[in-house]
Amino acid sequence: RQRGDGLSRQWLQRLQQLPYVFQGEGWVATHAGFDDSGRPDLHIREPFWDHYNGRYGRVIVGHTPRPAVECQGHIVMIDTGAVYGGLLSAFCPETDAVVQVHGPRVISESPAQQRELATRLPC
C-alpha cells in the first residue's frame, strides 16, 4: 500500500464525475475529439478535424502530443506532451491566451521514444 492511495482514490472519484465536454460561448473542450455523430470520443486517433464542420465553434482538444500548441481551422490542439517531459499547456478560448509550465518529471515515454530506445543498444 502506498502513501498516496487514499488521495488517489479521492481524486479518481472526483474526476469520474466530471463531464466529458466543457462548453462555453462559441467553443467546446474535450479530451480527444468527436465521433461521426458529434459525441465526445475519448480514444479517437484519426484527425477528426479534417471533417469537422464547425457546428460547436472552436474545439479545444488534447490527447495527441505535439511540440507546440497548434491550430487547424476551428481546432486548437493543446497537448504538448507534459507526461513525456514536454510542457503542460492550457488555453483560454475567451482571451486566446496560452499558459505553459514545465512538468516536474517524465512519467512515461512516448511511443516514438519507446521504439527508438528499443532499437538502440546502450553502449
Per-segment meaning from a language model:
Residues 1-88, 93-116, 121:
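Acidic, His/Gly-enriched loop-helix segments that form or flank divalent-metal centers
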